[in-house]
Amino acid sequence: MAKKSMIAKAQRKPKFQVRAYTRCRICGRPHSVYRDFGLCRVCLRKMASEGLIPGLRKASW
C-alpha cells in the first residue's frame, strides 16, 4: 500500500501540468497504471481473474 500522504499529494492539482501522474485506485501504486481502468497491473490481473471487470478475460492461445 502507498502512504496516505503520497496518495493525497497525487490528488492535488500540481503547479505544472506535466507533473501530474496516475495512481491505482485500489492500492495507490504509482507505476504500471492502465489509464482505461485506473488500476495497476497487479490489481487489474487480480480483478480480471475474479471476473470483476466485465468484458475482460485472460488470453490463451
UniProtKB/Swiss-Prot annotation:
UniProt lineage = Bacteria, Pseudomonadati, Campylobacterota, Epsilonproteobacteria, Campylobacterales
Name the cofactor(s): Zn(2+)
- Cysteines engaged in disulfide bonds, as pairs: none
Name the family the entry cites: Belongs to the universal ribosomal protein uS14 family. Zinc-binding uS14 subfamily.
What PANTHER family does the database record attribute to this sequence? 30S RIBOSOMAL PROTEIN S14, SMALL RIBOSOMAL SUBUNIT PROTEIN US14M
Q: Which GO terms describe its biological process?
A: translation
PROSITE patterns in alphabetical order: RIBOSOMAL_S14
Q: What is the UniProt remark on how the cofactor binds and its stoichiometry?
A: Binds 1 zinc ion per subunit.
Gene Ontology, cellular component aspect? cytoplasm; small ribosomal subunit
* One GO MF term attached to the UniProt entry: zinc ion binding
Ribonucleoprotein in keyword set: yes
Protein name from the UniProt record: Small ribosomal subunit protein uS14
**InterPro entries reported for this sequence:** Ribosomal_uS14, Ribosomal_uS14_bact, Ribosomal_uS14_CS, Ribosomal_uS14_sf
Q: Which domain of life is it from?
A: Bacteria
Which residues take part in binding Zn(2+)? C24, C27, C40, C43
Described by its record, this protein's role is as follows: Binds 16S rRNA, required for the assembly of 30S particles and may also be responsible for determining the conformation of the 16S rRNA at the A site.
Keywords tagged on the record: Metal-binding, Ribonucleoprotein, Ribosomal protein, RNA-binding, rRNA-binding, Zinc
